[in-house]
């Protein structure tokens, strides 16, 4: 067994850094000298810059895990366990999982075995054989989802590639625990688009129109949700990072190591006024529909010019309250509170002050969002393919939010 295994990290196909796994389980990250010296280098992560914008070049080793930026590229929870079980390894072995999945990760980053180092840390046949199928699960997150190609000339539908690499669509399968989740998300994302938010192209598809599903996904009912990937274009991959990566925290802390005020602060410093307004729209909308799962990984930055961040298009907008009785807390604190009902003009003013955002921009955007929601929701809720329980729950919940009542006056 080799004492050291090295993975090359590439950004837009160009080498930028290495991850070195030592025999004692430590992983060491280091930038390449050429990347450090390149004044026009593409941005890998805001978390790898100091408060003055300079590149950080010294990092501590991580024991038994990879650094947070890379840990957040890997699947979580049951999906990670499924992959690890198939490969015969422990779910905690992140370096090995990154070796398996690194050719098709979110954004424009890829991870490859260093030249002459094609074997994984433990050169086991089961791991080598599991790698091609594992790539089909290379999207980060908990929900069962795959990257897929759309069949424009073959009667429609989508195909999950046999070895997982490529694909400009995401297919999210029905939940085995909660009914109608794809339909719920389709409806909420559609409402958001009608309200003027930046939402990618999406559609509901019958399960029999999705080819290439791997074995072991279980018995599924309902439709799947297909979403066009905003990190893939005809010109190639576009780099993205979620806010767990931005803040340098591991996925396990996506609910407790940040808040919406902190996200707003980053957007105010790094992006545009339009992006700050879009952030407030999504935050208010998510509160009105009862989305209690907008944690750090459900907000992302995108790098259209490879260097400058912008708020990415919206994703994972759905109403969670129909599935969790009595749920009335957001995934993160707004500024002082997590209670959805307590989101008010005063709470947003506090958020704006602490995040150093324009209070007028924040409050005016919130008012406009509430007004648009009331109009669009009332006009469209019966035209969308969500369960009656979802619509009824939102009808009951939205008026409990203080902002909703304040702007109704």
Swiss-Prot record:
The keyword ATP-binding does not apply. Its EC number is 2.-.-.-. This is Putative kinase Y4dM. GO terms for cellular component: cytosol. InterPro entries: HipA-like_C, HipA_N1, HipA_Ser/Thr_kinase. Belongs to the HipA Ser/Thr kinase family. One of its GO terms (molecular function) is protein serine/threonine kinase activity. It is an enzyme of class 2 (transferase). Pfam families: Couple_hipA, HipA_C. Keywords: Kinase, Plasmid, Transferase. The active site is at 293 (proton acceptor).
């Amino acid at each position: 067994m080799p004492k050291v295994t090295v993975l090359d990290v590439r950004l837009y196909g160009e080498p930028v850094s290495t991850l070195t796994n030592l025999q004692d389980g430590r992983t060491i990250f280091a930038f390449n000298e050429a990347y450090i010296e390149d004044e026009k280098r593409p941005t890998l992560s805001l978390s790898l810059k100091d408060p003055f914008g300079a590149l950080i070049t010294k990092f501590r080793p991580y024991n038994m895990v990879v650094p947070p930026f890379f840990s957040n590229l890997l699947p979580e929870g049951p999906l990670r366990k499924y992959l690890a079980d198939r490969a015969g390894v422990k779910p905690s072995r992140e370096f090995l999982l990154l070796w398996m999945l690194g050719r098709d990760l979110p954004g424009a980053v890829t991870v490859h075995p260093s030249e002459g180092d094609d074997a994984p840390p433990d050169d086991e046949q089961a791991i080598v054989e599991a790698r091609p199928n594992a790539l089909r699960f290379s999207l980060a997150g908990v929900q069962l989802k795959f990257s897929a190609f759309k069949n424009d000339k073959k009667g429609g539908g989508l195909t999950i590639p046999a070895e997982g690499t490529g694909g400009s669509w995401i297919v999210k399968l029905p939940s085995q625990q909660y009914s109608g989740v794809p339909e719920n998300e389709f409806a909420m994302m559609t409402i958001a688009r009608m309200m003027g938010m930046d939402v990618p192209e999406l559609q509901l598809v019958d399960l029999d129109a999705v080819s290439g599903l791997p074995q072991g996904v279980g018995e599924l009912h309902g439709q799947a949700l297909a979403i066009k990937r905003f990190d893939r274009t005809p010109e190639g991959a576009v780099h993205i990072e979620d806010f767990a990566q931005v803040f340098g925290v591991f996925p396990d802390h996506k609910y407790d190591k940040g808040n919406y005020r902190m996200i707003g602060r980053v957007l105010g410093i790094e992006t545009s006024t339009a992006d700050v307004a879009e952030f407030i729209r999504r935050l208010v909308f998510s509160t009105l529909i009862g989305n209690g799962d907008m944690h750090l990984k459900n907000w992302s930055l995108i790098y259209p010019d490879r260097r400058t961040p912008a708020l990415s298009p919206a994703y994972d907008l759905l109403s969670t309250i129909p599935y969790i009785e009595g749920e009335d807390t957001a995934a993160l604190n707004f500024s002082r509170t997590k209670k959805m009902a307590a989101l008010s003009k005063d709470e947003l003013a506090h958020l704006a002050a602490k995040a150093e955002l324009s209070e007028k921009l924040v409050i005016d955007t919130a008012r406009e969002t509430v007004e648009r929601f009331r109009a669009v929701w009332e006009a469209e809720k019966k035209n969308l393919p969500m369960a009656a329980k979802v619509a009824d729950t939102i009808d009951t919940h939205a008026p409990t939010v203080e902002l909703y009542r304040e702007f109704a006056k």
